[in-house]
Amino acid sequence: MKQNYILYTKLYNDDSFTHLFIFIYNFLFIIIMKQYDYRNPLDIQEALMAAEHKRKLITESKIDAHDKKIRLLFFEFEKYMNVTTYEADDVDIVFIASDSCKYELKNNVLTINDYNNKLIKVDLTNDINNTIIYAKAGYTLNKMTFLLNKFVEAGFIVINDPRKIITSSDKYLTALLLDEYSINQPKYTIVTADDCNTDDPKKDFEKILKPIYGNVNEDNKYVCKLLNGHGGNGVFICKGKNILSIIQCIFSIDDSQKILIQQKLDIKDGDIRAYVLTYNGKQELVTCITRKKANNDFRTNISLGSTFEKFDLTNEQKKFAFNVAEKTGLMFCGVDMCIDEKTNKLYVIEINGAPGAPVPIGLSEEENHHQHAEYYQMFTNKLMSILK
């Protein structure tokens, strides 16, 4: 099932309860969708450990010495453009819709259908040096768990490491990782249903919130995030005077949820996303954009209609983004950063382990294809330069 739903919550207004019913409706939808969320990190980890020795045999010289074009199998979450392949200078990209692809494994040869049901064959023994796997938003799907296990076990280069994608897809684990390396991020706390079910929940909840601002004030604004949301889903802002009631309402629907509550920064000139490749100690900046919120929404997700433009990082900002990307262990990620107007410091907002192409919504099919093609040309060129 496609998970391209959008949470239309707008709880950023002073009167948060005006739109609370919208949030509850969409929250219920997310809960229903959770039954499709599947992870098997133990199986993936075992596969990675079993393949560790084989991976070491894939040397840089082997990648550099190939006499064929590299084939990039791009598992996109859904079919977004009417194209099956795109030929770059050194790479042929084959687009596969990970939510609807069919596959068959016989004699160590994996057969998968692309967007237009053309059969793509991958020899898990002989194609290891000329095929790279890029799975965007595929790690939460049953079939993709199986496929990625097979590719990783065989020793293919897989973007991204399944063990690391689990961390980046969980906002709390990401926050803990940033803490481990003392990387600037908004002050935060994690809240569970038990925190709201005490004898004096108001008093106890204030103790939880106090470290974020150093005080408890009804006008303090907080960014609240469901841990596994993406694309702006499950993210809302509320004031201190409303936060306990709203959180209690969420837990009354699903008391197994955990909610990350963050300090709301005064973001200067929109946020910044740096697309960073990291491999064997080498790093490349694929591109960088700054995103502006749209329609009075505080979120800057392109999928929600925000605008963006190219952004030139300063040396300090580039060094910061590269350091964050390296610490995640991800081969490719989007590092979302912002500059706080009050402190003028650079902060990490989120780390995206499966960043989408920076292409605006609402384009014609022809222009949409053109801009995606330009991005993938740039991406594959950077990818090949870092693999050599």
Regions found by a protein language model. Name each.
Residues 13-14:
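Acidic/polar hotspots within intrinsically disordered regions
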Residues 38-48, 60, 308-312, 326-330, ...:
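C-terminal active-site "lid" helix and adjoining low-complexity regulatory extension at the edge
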Residues 219-220, 228-320:
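Phosphate-binding site of ATP-dependent enzymes
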Residues 222, 284-287, 345-350:
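Protein kinase-like catalytic core scaffold
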Residues 262-263, 272-273, 330-342:
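A short glycine-rich, hydrophobically flanked beta-strand micro-motif that places a catalytic Asp/Glu
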